[in-house]
Amino acid sequence: MKPVISVIMLTAVLLGATSPCFGAVAIEGVAFEKTSRVGTNDLHLRGVGLLRYMYFIKAYVGALYMRPQDDAGQALAMTPRRLELQYFHAISAADFAEATTQKVKDNVSPETMASIQDRLKTFNALYRDVQPGDRYALTYLPGSGTELLLNGQSLGRIPGDDFAAAVFAIWLGPAPIDEDFRDTLLGVR
């Protein structure tokens, strides 16, 4: 009996070591690493979630990375963070730009919107059309700005702490794209 248990244990270890999700967290078949390096900061996975459109259409899955010492209330503060979103459907760059502008407006004051308007236009011009399986990453590093990446390739960086707070508010702010998704990313649900 002992050799059978040993073989089963060894098989489980070997399968786990070759699994694409080893050292990662998976949701809806999409793996996210448990840590992400931003500048000199090791960010830890805070939460992962699935965003549904009209309750039954899977739009995308996301993962939020923050420093371990930062709590959910600091999600929009001047602290390093990274949000990764992997899409299940094709979405045009124009649709991203339109949705980004609207959700930023929903989350910031008219004064803030006026002060970031030019940077928001520049940011929206960075968007590219995505296909199923593509992954955007939004990374903020204080003093360096907010960087948008598509499938690991940098598309550009926009300066300003105010800009970072406004853009991350789309998912993490008081009027997010979806409250359940926000709370899951923040690890409070």
Label each residue range with its predicted role.
Residues 7-17:
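Bacterial N-terminal signal peptides
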Residues 1-4:
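Positively charged n-region of N-terminal signal peptides that target proteins for export
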